[in-house]
Amino acid sequence: MTSWEGGIITSYVNEFENLDGHGHGVKLEPTCNVPYTTFSLQSWRDGLDAKILALKYRHIGTYISLTRDRDTGRVYPDPVHGTPRIQYDMSDFDREHTLEGVIALTKICYVARATEIRAHLAGLAPFVARDGGKRQAEHQPGTDPEFTDPDFAAWIKRLRRADNKPPTAMCVSAHQMGSCRMSADEESGVVDMQGRVWGTSGLYVADASVFPSASGVNPMVTAMALADWISRGVAADLSS
């Protein structure tokens, strides 16, 4: 298996993308499996485990629970010297969604007959198929392995008890959005519907920071569309 080659997100599971009924949840995706991401995200156990894991690299697949978070952080000026500061702590609400996605991923790996499953949580040993994968081979489609394999069920129970709050859990934030959100009025955001900063002449923002909220998906096409829209407005303003 050469999972470090080819596209990084060629499929996804959207069954869990609306866990609260308001569009907040997770998508399950395969991700980039190059060495610096694969091994930097592993929970440290000991040197021997790290070396053995490196030897297994050709057999490793990496997956993520991509969370559309409900709760927000903030960007603010340092009160002393004005340097921009970032404050973001993942809320319990959003962490619960992330954990549900991780649990779903472990079940997908189980039915795909993975012989070892790691959840990137400090202190949580990996699930290892001690019977050589016999129970996985006997798994019936449409059944939940949490209720058919006692060993796997016990491991899932330990996973649910584990604290998935950083720094115990490895969380990665990518594609930051909405720090200069677009809004219909000055009280609700930073820029207007044309990307112009409220109350400032000649200043525009044209990237993912103008999203009204996190999109919950990789935002490249949306960011390009917004940049195209705003840049056309800039051209129109300059020519008028």
Model feature map: region roles:
Residues 1-109, 116, 126-131, 136-138, ...:
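FAD cofactor-binding and catalytic pocket of flavoenzymes
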Residues 8, 202, 216, 232-240:
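N-terminal export/assembly segments and adjacent metallocofactor-ligating motifs
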